[in-house]
């Protein structure tokens, strides 16, 4: 499984443009979300136990925050040839079965993950209206047991940002499986 921690890209780093196909058969770009106040990009996949454990939390977070102008976007950058569970076809199945309520995009070339310096699943990046990085870190303090969560880092960060306040707590790296890079 190979546990990895996110690289903690510097705050203020601009979002990188992309154009990726979604599990809903639409093509999305960074500009597709221009009307959203906050953009939460989550590098994720279908097979990683860390992602499986938090997926419902992400679905719930989208429901909780969409009326406030928050848009979650999942991006799967794994090599689907070596990891067929992470194919676009299986993304479509997972989207239907789990009721994923945010765009789930396939980064076939892996260029988007490399441009964002993403290394693990899940790897979370929050961008403000000007699309500068304002939060990167974990979703909460217990990836494995939702009922034992005592700090919802991502949700709390979104609340502070929406209120126009600085995030007062340390941003702790996300952790999960490594992105499954293509062999050159």
Feature map (PLM): residue ranges:
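Chalcogenol-based redox active-site neighborhoods
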Residues: 1-171, 178-184
């Amino acid at each position: 499984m190979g546990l990895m921690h996110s690289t903690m890209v510097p705050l203020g780093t601009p979002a990188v443009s992309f154009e990726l196909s979604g599990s809903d058969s639409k093509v999305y770009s960074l500009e597709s979300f221009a009307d959203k106040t906050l953009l939460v990009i989550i590098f994720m996949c279908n097979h990683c136990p860390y992602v499986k454990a938090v997926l419902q939390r992400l679905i719930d977070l989208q429901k909780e925050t969409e009326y406030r102008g928050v848009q979650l976007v999942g991006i799967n950058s794994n090599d689907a040839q070596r990891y067929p569970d992470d194919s676009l076809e299986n993304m479509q199945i997972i989207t239907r079965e789990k009721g994923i309520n945010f765009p789930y995009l396939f980064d076939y070339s892996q260029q988007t993950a490399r441009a964002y310096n993403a290394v693990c699943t899940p790897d979370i990046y929050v961008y403000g209206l000007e699309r500068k990085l304002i939060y990167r870190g974990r979703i909460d303090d217990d990836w494995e047991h939702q009922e034992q969560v005592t700090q919802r880092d991502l949700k709390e960060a979104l609340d502070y940002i929406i209120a126009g306040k600085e995030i007062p707590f340390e941003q702790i790296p996300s952790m999960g499986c490594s992105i499954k890079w293509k062999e050159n």
